[in-house]
């Protein structure tokens, strides 16, 4: 099986939220999960809500993204809804904690949605961090 023949050192996801983990009272344009658990909606992570977030790598990524001039928030209590966990569910054979992961929320549901220009800048800053990490 092809899915069983690969290994990931780190998975970085760019995902939306559908008002299951983030709400109008605090809806950032971008948010990096320093610690995260699955919200359990749509049964993704319902039985095991643990996501293997690499805290040191996530904090390093936040610092480097900020250094690149992209404003990003971070969360030590991210509740990852199906917009974030569905990808991990299928990629990691239902084991959300199978590989070290960094979850990045891109607000695509609540006004004011970040511009395409800002979103591309975020992706560029993340890629620069991964290519030239210390």
What are these regions (language model features)?
Residues 1-134:
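Active-site histidine-anchored catalytic micro-motif
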